[in-house]
Amino acid sequence: METFVRLFKDSPQQRSDAWHAIRRTQVGGSDLASVLGLNPYKSYYIILAEKANLFKKNLNRAACSWGTLFERVSKDLLELFCQTTVIGDNIHIDGTYLGYPGHSNSPDGFCHLTLGYTQQSWEIKTIFNNVRYEATKRIPVLVEIKSPFNRKIKNSVPSYYMPQIQSGLALSPPISMGIYVEAMFRVCGIHQLGSNNETNTDIHPPESMLPLAWGIITICSTQEHTEAPQDFGTLDAETFRQLLETLYQKDQYTIHYSMPYETACPEMPNVVGYFGWKVFIFQIIPVMKHPQFLKDKYPIIQQFLRDLHTIKASPSPMETYEKICCSEESALSTEDIDNFTDMLT
């Protein structure tokens, strides 16, 4: 696994300008559900228009900021709960090296997990498993992390995330299993931190259970800031949403993370404010590699790339786009969609 990750050490770093530029010309892992017709929130034709630069992305900046903020926290918790180290969380894997030009994947990372065998099955070993296993083994896995702001967490992988995970597995030959990590975080004031269920109930519904962990996110200005820091964990819901939208402008702020279970605010210069977090659900769901996945679906990726090239090369891009939308039908059949549902079982 480590040798594989080192192959991409010089790839564009995730979320860098070079990375964004490449993704505008490729089908990335997170694009794949839309291209395959499996994303209920964004169709083939919407993402085609976005990549052809026919209109700006309709980004939910607050949700994007939330996901970015808590991706780092989720990695820290995964390392703690599974006694592992996540690597390769900033690389970009171009599919050209495996014969899939135009397709790429930017994984949330890779790590080794311990599987324990008990009652005729294997399970992922965590610090919460007080079990004497009959046997154990250590395996490398691909990591995919989600931390939804509002969506309810279920004990399964949403079908529209499965293509992203299978893409990462297909472009990572040494890896045969992925894990889908989904965490439910809640915001709290600094005074509410600790082993209790107190949270900011203006932002989130009340919680009845105790948290698995807690910590602090500190926001610093890139300019000199001398005002007293604010406890953002006590804001009302609308003001906190505005804060998340402001944090989307990453060049104005730097973000600092406490270690899990810390409750003391850090002393550092130019602190604008901080807020506490608690995690109440932290699911780790195994996903096995589907060997034929990318081979079977790559023709649809190629068709998308041809459509994209046709639009960009046209003297009348919007007119060409409209013709493509009117002339083509859905790229996937009902059987294809059923096959993806089967992967979840």
Curated annotation (Swiss-Prot):
**What does the entry give for GO biological process?**
symbiont-mediated suppression of host NF-kappaB cascade
Xref: Gene3D superfamilies? 3.90.320.10
Coiled-coil boundaries: none
Is Zinc-finger included in the keywords of this UniProt record? Answer: no
One protein family per Pfam: YqaJ
Which protein family is it in?
Belongs to the asfivirus D345L family.
Q: What does this protein do?
A: Plays a role in the negative regulation of host NF-kappa-B signaling pathway. Mechanistically, recruits host IKKA/CHUK and IKBKB to suppress their kinase activity towards NFKBIA.
Q: Summarize the subunit comment.
A: Interacts with IKKA/CHUK and IKBKB.
Provide the protein's localization: Host cytoplasm
Name of the protein described by the UniProt record: Protein D345L
For this UniProt record, give its keywords in alphabetical order, as a comma-separated list: Host cytoplasm, Host-virus interaction, Inhibition of host NF-kappa-B by virus
Superkingdom of origin organism: Viruses
According to its UniProt entry, this protein's organism is African swine fever virus (strain Badajoz 1971 Vero-adapted)
One GO cellular component term of this record is:
host cell cytoplasm
